[in-house]
Design a protein with these regions (language model features):
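Short acidic (Asp/Glu) and glycine-rich catalytic loops that position anionic groups and cofactors
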Residues: 47-48, 126, 204-211, 239-246, ...
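Generic secondary-structure signature for well-ordered alpha-helical cores
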Residues: 74, 78, 108-111, 152-156, ...
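Short, flexible, solvent-exposed loop/turn segments with mixed acidic/basic and small polar residues
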Residues: 41-46, 77-83, 237-241, 302-307, ...
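N-terminal basic/disordered segments at the start of proteins
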Residues: 1-65, 174, 185, 189-192, ...
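Mobile "lid/hinge" segments at catalytic clefts and subdomain interfaces of large enzymes
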Residues: 2, 158-262, 437-494
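Small-residue-enriched alpha-helical segments and adjacent helix-cap loops
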Residues: 23-27, 49-195, 225, 316-447
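Long hydrophobic segments that form regular secondary structure
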Residues: 303-312, 318-344, 480, 484-496
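Terminal amphipathic helices with adjacent charged low-complexity linkers/tails
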Residues: 93, 97-98, 105-110, 235-299, ...
């Protein structure tokens, strides 16, 4: 075990002690969160159970890690696994002793939780199809993994004002959300020369902001200099006193964009003068053929790869919650088919890549009962209440109620978009960047406090056009399923 892992192992015993104090009400929710958040552990509502978030680097799931998660579900009788909106896995409803046991075992397998929460660099997001997507510029996977390694080697040393999110996209589709992160990179090329376009100081949640484009090309091998410069700027200019205004997006709002970019340049120059952070990775331009011979038709669960004859199957469980039994079925398939590769997405899905035609057919059949197939079925939702400590509304229940209403009334789902649902304004369900989004809250209506959701429309993410959704108003939670049903009928009439 290396020195860093030894430090992380020692932290687990401190978490164990703090967890028991919290359960016994000897320390507050805030005090416990201050200790546990940086370790990827949070108390659930009620104060007796806990959740753990694994730092599955950029969503890549090795066979060893798939097996490990499967074994955890069996040993600790975990019914469901949650795929998050940042390419990670969460396990819920665990006791603190079990949490600590899981962390120790995971550490032995290089599956980390450190930095899964708290004021640290979070999981580095990438396009889930990076390396196999038609039309991509180049595969960003190795660069993302190097950034993750760089972060993890220093994870216990960071003292940031708030969390820092980094994303890399392999094409202009911006599937990783580079244009809405603290630091984003999108693969590009000019005259056959690969480079990154860079974006700074964006983010979702309260007072969201689209990232600021950086007007210079970033050489792929130099990406760590730009990462380190942003960290240093964040430490120098971030707000350590007001948590509500501590994210990077508040810095250019305070300084002005021109001054912010000038300050960033100063930090970049200094980093380049003082450190050697060149990467020994070559960005190789991806090739997309003019013609392909795929026999299976594409749909929302099946994508043609740029490698002729190969497919990716997209498994989206309802609300990102996959039962442990269904997860095991997928894990067994991947273990039996060595060419298959699993990656988690930003949309609470698992992408199983590099499948030939026969393998794709088999996996589609295996997942048929639990794989959501239409856009509205593939809606996203954060965990919400009754699990989340800070959640206000039942986000997952809302999605279930919408689907039940549509199916009960035999309404066509064909024209409905996915809905992105957050249980509060924190945007864990990314409600601000979906075609339609909902954010939970409470509101007095007459003499009653009602369950309500703010409704947003028109959000989207891409290199050319990233838009934050417009808030239209607030709806009673009880009325939303019927509203979606009526919308479906109107869309069908207009053939949209």
């Amino acid at each position: 075990m290396n020195k860093q892992d030894e430090i992380l192992k020692l932290e687990i015993s401190k978490l164990h002690e703090a967890g028991h104090k919290f359960v016994n009400k000897e320390i507050s929710v805030g005090d416990f969160k201050g200790i546990s958040g940086g370790m990827g552990v949070y108390a659930q509502r009620g104060g007796q159970d806990f959740m753990i978030r694994f730092r599955t680097n950029s969503g890549l799931m090795s066979i060893d890690h798939l097996e490990l998660i499967k074994n955890f579900t069996e040993k600790y009788e975990i019914e469901d696994i949650h795929f998050t909106t940042r390419q990670a896995i969460q396990l819920h409803h665990l006791k603190i002793d079990d949490i600590c046991d899981i962390m120790e075992t995971a550490l032995e397998h290089k599956l980390y939780t450190r930095g899964g929460g708290g004021n640290y660099p979070r999981n580095v997001a990438i396009s889930p199809m990076s390396g196999v997507e038609k039309g991509e510029i180049f595969d960003v996977t190795e660069f993302a993994l190097k950034i993750s390694e760089y972060f993890m080697n220093r994870i216990t040393e960071y003292k940031l004002p708030r969390k820092l999110k980094v994303a890399l996209s392999s094409s202009d589709r911006d599937a990783a959300g580079a244009t809405i992160n603290d630091l984003g990179f999108i693969a590009a090329q000019e005259n056959g020369e690969p480079f990154f376009r860079m974006y700074l100081a964006g983010g979702l949640g309260n007072n969201p902001g689209i990232s600021i484009p950086y007007d210079k090309k970033v050489a792929p091998k130099e990406i760590l200099y730009y990462i380190e410069a942003m960290i240093n700027l964040f430490i120098a200019e971030g707000d350590y006193n007001n948590r509500a205004k501590a994210r990077t997006r508040y810095i250019p709002r305070r300084m002005g964009i021109a001054e912010f970019l000038a300050a960033y340049e100063k930090h970049l120059i200094k980093v380049k003068e003082e450190k050697n952070l060149d990467l020994d990775i070559k960005a190789v331009l991806s090739e997309t053929q003019e013609e392909y011979s795929h026999n299976l038709e594409e749909n929302l669960s099946l994508v043609h790869q740029r490698q002729d004859g190969l497919y990716t199957v997209i498994i989206h469980p309802l609300n990102g919650q996959i039962s442990s039994k269904d997860f095991e079925k997928v894990a067994v398939f991947i273990k039996e088919n060595k060419n298959a590769e699993a990656r988690l997405s930003m949309t609470e899905s698992m992408y199983v890549r590099n499948l030939n035609e026969e393998q794709a057919k088999v996996l589609l059949k295996i997942t048929d009962k639990f794989r959501q197939k239409t856009k509205i079925q593939q809606s996203m939702s954060c965990v919400g209440i009754p699990t989340c400590q800070i959640g206000i509304e039942q986000s997952q229940t809302l999605v279930k109620n919408i689907l039940e209403y549509i199916q009960k009334n035999n309404i066509s789902e064909e024209n409905l978009p996915s809905v992105y649902v957050s249980g509060c304004q924190n945007s864990c369900g990314r409600h601000q960047v979906g075609d339609m989004g909902f954010a939970g809250g409470k509101k007095r209506v007459g003499d009653k406090i009602e369950d309500v959701f703010d409704i947003y429309i028109g959000g989207m993410v891409s290199r050319e056009k990233t838009i934050l959704g417009t808030k239209l108003g607030t709806m009673l939670m009880s009325q939303i399923p019927e509203f979606i049903g009526e919308l479906a009928i109107e869309l069908e009439k207009s053939n949209m």
